[in-house]
Amino acid sequence: MFTSQDARDSRPDRELRMMNDVLMTYPYTVIHLPAQNMLSTAKGMVNIAENYRDYPILAIFYVKYLMKKLPYGVIPVNLEWPEPYVVLNTILKRLKEHKFFANKDKEDFAERLHKLIAPDVSIPESRKDEILGQQKKERVVTKTINENFLDPVNARPRLQRFFEKLHNGTLVENLEVGLCKVEILVSSKAMLGQSFKLQIMAANVRELWVGEMVCNMITNETDYGFDEGGGDDDEGSSVEVQNSQSASPGQDQEAQRAPEAPETSSQLFDKIVSALQDDPDSAKAQLGQCRKLASYLLSHKREQEDFFMQTKDTRARLYLDLKGCLGSSWKFSIYRGVRCKQNGQLKVSLKPSNSGHLSGFWVNIKMTSQGNTLDDIRLQVRCDILGKDTNRRGGSEKDPEDQSETESSG
């Protein structure tokens, strides 16, 4: 008879789970085709560089790293590959920093892994700390520009003129080297007025925050517990606890006797969105409910697919809302996706077309309220204007906030 102990023994041991985490085995699927010296991914085929031919684990890891970093981007067939030791360093660093090694010999394990996946790759002594995504030497900030567009009087034409100068390069003239940091604050209420459009935009922000948060939880199952400072389960269930405490003893006994009807994904989603609408500051308290929804969708694949598609549609609607507020006649595209913060804010990456001197935009979306009533949706737009010399050498597409803030990507 299959006992509970047999079930425990049949589970992957902690070492295997750790290796799955370190090598990002899930959720990214990359297949090695040794005969063609290529990798097959959901985003197409990728040629493996010659110096990676004998190290397919390194090649697979690098492509998975790019898939995680650029979830909505395109991975070209002919990639620009870093030195193999950089990828190896990254893997070994992830291994050593894994929570599994709280009281274990991580150096010995790292040495064994090195010999297993890349025995002939040597790491130069001066390059032992060089890893993927490492922040390059910061460019000198030679100028900063801050503008607010909060007054509804002439807000739209003022913003339009500002963007025109930003786009054609006349906002900052004679910037030869370094960069200019630009930050503007836009009031959606000033752009849209106290109209139905503002309410629709607020609904899209709430729905997209829930959608992105749940999709991130589903995609990153290993991060399900929010180890990095997220709200805990007690916090997430605080609304239900308060309701239970306020019920009378008779109601409480009746509730215990009555069978609880299972909630569907749409019911759970609507409950979270309604809670955010009733209390705009309750985002962190809803993380527990988001986990509950993610757990449900993990066991209902068809509904999970529909949920991902619904979130994609909401993302497209919010993009139209942003264009309506920013009022720019030049084209944007969502570049590096959307990040959701646990406090309910969203960050959207936008890339303007035909603007090589701009590094791209990050728009931080924050709803403000008076009591429980929506007051405004503030858009904090940040970008870097690259100096002419910097632009010729190729500008960075990183988040302008990354110099002062470390944040998870979802």
UniProtKB/Swiss-Prot annotation:
Residues 239-253 have a biased composition (Polar residues). This is Trans-acting factor B. Plasmid partition require REP1, REP2, and a cis-acting DNA sequence (known as STB). REP1 may act by intercalating in the yeast nuclear matrix and binding STB either directly or via REP2. Keywords: Plasmid, Plasmid partition. The keyword Cell membrane does not apply. Residues 388-398 have a biased composition (Basic and acidic residues). It comes from Zygosaccharomyces rouxii. Pfam families: Rep_4. InterPro entries: Rep_fungi (IPR008897).
